Amino acid sequence: MKLTCVLIVAVLILAACQFTAANMARYGKTQIARSDVKSIDARRPKCCCVCGVVGRKCCSTWKDCHPVHLPCPSSG
């Protein structure tokens, strides 16, 4: 009986460890993916957008550029 209890506890601990390892691996992959997105976004050049009659405005991301993407002038 004692041996059975020890085996059950050992199996439960092993299962918990595997579950934790799988979750950590999944979480690690998610973290890597997020940091890749950030670094890709940081490498993109800042763009200048034509904003109607108001004129040009520099945006932090390409997503902010609407409706036209233009390269920033070298003077600016």
UniProtKB/Swiss-Prot annotation:
It is found in: Secreted. GO terms for molecular function: toxin activity. Expressed by the venom duct. The keyword rRNA-binding does not apply. May contain 4 disulfide bonds. Keywords: Disulfide bond, Neurotoxin, Pharmaceutical, Secreted, Signal, Toxin. One of its GO terms (cellular component) is extracellular region. It comes from the Eukaryota. Residues 1-43 form the signal peptide. Belongs to the conotoxin O1 superfamily. Is able to inhibit the growth of Mycobacterium tuberculosis (MIC=0.22-3.52 uM against strain H37Rv and 2 multidrug-resistant strains). May also show neurotoxic activity. The cysteine framework is XXIX (CCC-C-CC-C-C). This is Conotoxin Cal29b. It comes from Californiconus californicus (California cone).
